Amino acid sequence: MKKILLTLALVAAAQFTFAQEKTDDAKQPASELMTQLRLASDLARYGYETYSASALIEAARILNGVPTYELTPESFIKGEGTADGKAQKTEFSVEQLLKDARAYADGNVTLLALADQVKIDNGTSRGRVGGAAVHEDCVYANCTDNYTIRFIAGEEAEVAVVGDGDTDLDLYIYDSNGNLIEKDDDYTDTCYCSWTPKWTGAFTIKIKNRGGVCNYY
């Protein structure tokens, strides 16, 4: 099963001339791994918005238990634009979350002790087997970022996008023939799509920014 936050799957492609079947409107629930990643991201965002040390510590604890690796797309085409001086979103890593949690704790010994209980993973247990590919980037105002990723036939594929809250982001999944097979185009910047590929091959993931400023996801 391949997952991405942005989460995607990779393997060798086969050539087909017919369209990947579009998934049914009834959405399948997200996997436990993807649910944990999205929960951690939501907690981190809340923690930074409210200066909550406890929320950041819990986000770090969840992330520390989820195997992840950096997404390596087959190709990546970034929409043309600029960040217009907007400050970059804080990295949601275990180390950064705990560092900021300790600062927000303001000497509270209970919170500092909770932060110390979260064991920082040095990376030895975070491999590709059973993990999720993750990537952080910025989609410029009124632009679209395009990722090409290979997914495995018969294995559930999942893609989630969590923005910084400033604009509406939409997520679209296309097969190798350009057919739209899945989308999440609500009015938020939190998106999720899942499908089961009929064949092993390349899929295009498009992240569209509907707003007038860049959005860090």
Report residues per predicted region:
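Acidic, Ser/Thr/Pro-rich low-complexity intrinsically disordered segments
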Residues: 50, 130, 134-216
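Sec/Tat signal peptide C-region and signal peptidase I cleavage site
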Residues: 15-19
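Alpha-helical, heptad-rich or low-complexity scaffold/stalk segments
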Residues: 20-100
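Single-residue recognition of alpha-helix boundary sites
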Residues: 13-14, 62
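Non-catalytic extracellular/lumenal accessory regions of secreted precursors
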Residues: 63-66, 70, 77-79, 83-148, ...
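Sec-dependent N-terminal signal peptides
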Residues: 4-13
